[in-house]
Amino acid sequence: MIALLSALSDGKKHFYTDLCQELSVTKQQLAEDLQQLDQQGIEICCEADGCYWLAAAELLDRAFLTKNLPHQQLLIQPVIDSTNQYLLNNLSKLSNNSVCLAEYQFAGRGRRGRQWLSPFAGQVIMSYYRIFSTNCDISGLSLAVGMAVAQALTELNLHSVQLKWPNDIWLNGKKLGGILIEMKHNPHLAQNQVVIGLGLNVNLPKKIVVDQPITMVSEQQNINRNLLIVKLTQHLAQALTLFEQQGLSAFIPKWRQYDAFYQKKVKLLLENQSIIGIEQGINAKGELLLNTEDNQQLSFSIGEISLRLISDES
């Protein structure tokens, strides 16, 4: 199935017999692969003469992206296991601020090892590579990244953009996307090599099934996906430079603007207990601040923690 998707990802029409020959499969095997793609929510068009092509109308535009992001090393992989993993596997070949983009990833992962859903050409699937000195405290980096994403979306006239600590992007109270940050330490160069993964729903197929309320950009605005990638990348680059110079403290005032749960009653689900209180934003380390029911102010670092609105429990 993956080989077939790779072959079709050029956006061109392909004859059935040519696909069989190119992929070295039988007609029956090709039919089964086409059925699997359909079950994954990937729409394939066909004509009576036996031509097949992907229904996705808006594919990644290498020329447009290269022209508008001249300072980034762009690595466009139509079909890939994981954009984060691709960068992590190729650190020695990357320049600072490299960006990996994909139409579809079949082994994408989210926070705490969860699989990241990835319909073909329906999302922004990107990973951003940045080198930080070991002197730079990268605590709370995902929060700074979230604010960069929120500002990019707001600039494109999306309304009700919010952030849920520590790494979710919300739109109209539903999940729009998520952030996953992974790092490798290079002691010889005194560097932290950081890979920032971002997945953002743009235009999802109707048949997609998920276990939580989600939304997509197209429910508010018809924004060109390539333009969206450009804006996200530009805001990310600016935010990462500011973060490197001033740390997370430079972002705290803006965090309150986007914090979905600020001054609201929430429940924190820890490994062995739950704590109820009023969410009070974040501190300079990126820790969540909570005023508990017995008037304690507690702070919680990013880890095995889930945050819920009390109203979600009803």
What is the predicted role of each segment?
Residues 3, 10, 17, 96, ...:
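Catalytic beta-strand/loop module used to bind and position nucleotide/cofactor moieties
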Residues 2-154:
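N-terminal lobe of the biotin/lipoate ligase/transferase fold
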